[in-house]
């Protein structure tokens, strides 16, 4: 449980270390996260900080959301996220305040959560890394077919969870243990080592690593 940031994936590039080693990195743009609500044990049964970021057209904001943002004294954002926190982490936080990239430091290990790219309906080879069947030796139309999916009369059915063709991607994915390479407070940008989930422009959540 820790406060994190909601940002937007800008894409990947690379940087060079002093030794000349190329390091692949992902750039995350983090607009100021505006605090819309602070939840406490007394009022909500748990402790959390609720934030919003970005902008949304007024015509796209419901009346309930307008009231919620107005009560907090912040502009309507494109999404609302919550971070479970401890009592100590609530200190100094107040509704209407902001959280920026200075929350993190260079060298800190973080977990990044995003929505993976949707691949549509895919077969077993692409979806589950199944091996293909023989290219020749009498095989004509079954090169990428799954093969047997069950047993015989007993149990006479395909077990739940069997790896088969189906929808791939477009799901919530968390990549753990990424190192922060750079924190640019002037541009509100985080640079993390390695790849993160989702397409360019997608929303991501950056949290202190749970296994660090």
Swiss-Prot record:
Signal peptide: none annotated. Residues 136-155 are annotated as: Disordered. It comes from the Bacteria. Gene3D superfamilies: 3.30.160.810, Translation factors. GO terms for cellular component: cytosolic large ribosomal subunit. GO terms for biological process: translation. GO terms for molecular function: rRNA binding; structural constituent of ribosome. The keyword Cytoplasm does not apply. Methylated by PrmB. Part of the 50S ribosomal subunit. Forms a cluster with proteins L14 and L19. PANTHER family: 50S RIBOSOMAL PROTEIN L3, LARGE RIBOSOMAL SUBUNIT PROTEIN UL3C. Belongs to the universal ribosomal protein uL3 family. This is Large ribosomal subunit protein uL3. It comes from Acinetobacter baumannii (strain SDF).
